A protein has these predicted regions:
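Long, non-coiled-coil amphipathic alpha-helical linker/lever segments
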Residues: 1-26, 128, 132, 144
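ATPase nucleotide-binding head domains, primarily ABC-like/P-loop NTPase cores
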Residues: 28, 35-253
């Protein structure tokens, strides 16, 4: 036994790596077996391509899932998504992120078809403060954005997802910072999606129409009930529901 250990112990890490790859590939094969309608993505040689038909979040049951087409092509492209609370903005960003990770790992994705460039995915979503690290919410957001910006400035092919960025500060500073960051990002080959309630950001489509496109999710009020169709539509959102939600819980507005 000692002779065997002496001879082969140096190979143990290689064996574990192969076993890990087999487990990962087995998991992907299991996904394909159980979800035959999922597509294997085609990997693009050119940078900046993320195209999908009927893309959805796989953790939502098929009977409840609303899928959407998505297209982001070209360096510096930013899709700005607006919409009322609970309309599906954050869930859609999560769907983009998880499917991008799955697809580039070699797995089928929850979509009818998909084409991807070999992006590196970076996100600023659900950022929180930290008592242990003495970080306020706003500074934690800045630290996350700093990491993303540094990678982009190095010229790497990045796809980013920014959900309600800079929400930890006042409205004026948030708008100024978000507008400045987006104007900076379009100058690099990274592309991504920004979800926001701030309609001021949608004006960038007029300023940079070849780089920035507006999309939105809708919400509807029927009687005292809120309704959502979770369908991604072109253009900026024209209706919001925050006041209706406040009234619903008893705030007299």
């Amino acid at each position: 036994l000692e002779r065997w250990k002496s001879r082969f112990s140096g190979d143990a890490m290689g064996w574990l790596q192969v076993l890990g790859e087999v487990e990962a590939l087995s998991s992907f094969a299991n996904l394909h077996f159980n979800f035959r309608d999922w597509a294997f993505p085609e990997i693009e040689e050119e940078s900046g391509v993320f195209r999908a038909e009927a893309l959805g979040h796989f953790l939502i049951p098929p009977e409840d899932r609303i899928s959407n087409d998505f297209l982001a092509e070209g360096r510096g492209t930013i899709l700005v998504i607006t919409g009322p609370n609970m309309a599906g903005k954050s869930t859609f960003l999560k769907a983009l992120g998880v499917n991008l990770v799955l697809g580039l790992a070699g797995s089928p994705v929850c979509a009818r078809s998909c084409r991807l460039s070999p992006f590196k995915l970076y996100t600023s979503m659900k950022v929180s403060d930290s008592l242990d690290k003495h970080l306020s919410l706003f500074y934690a957001e800045l630290q996350r954005l700093k990491v993303i910006l540094e990678v982009i400035l190095r010229g790497e092919d990045v796809f980013y997802l920014l959900d309600e960025m800079l929400k930890g500060t006042n409205a004026l500073d948030r708008q100024a910072g978000a507008l400045a960051l987006m104007r900076q990002l379009v100058g690099f080959k990274a592309s991504g999606v920004v979800a926001t309630h701030d309609l001021e950001l949608t004006r960038l489509e007029e300023e940079l129409p070849e780089k920035i496109k507006n999309f939105h999710f809708d919400g509807f009020v029927e009687g005292d009930q809120l309704r959502f169709d979770y369908i991604l539509k072109p253009g900026k959102c024209e209706s919001f529901n925050a006041l209706a939600l406040m009234r619903k819980i008893g705030i007299k507005i």
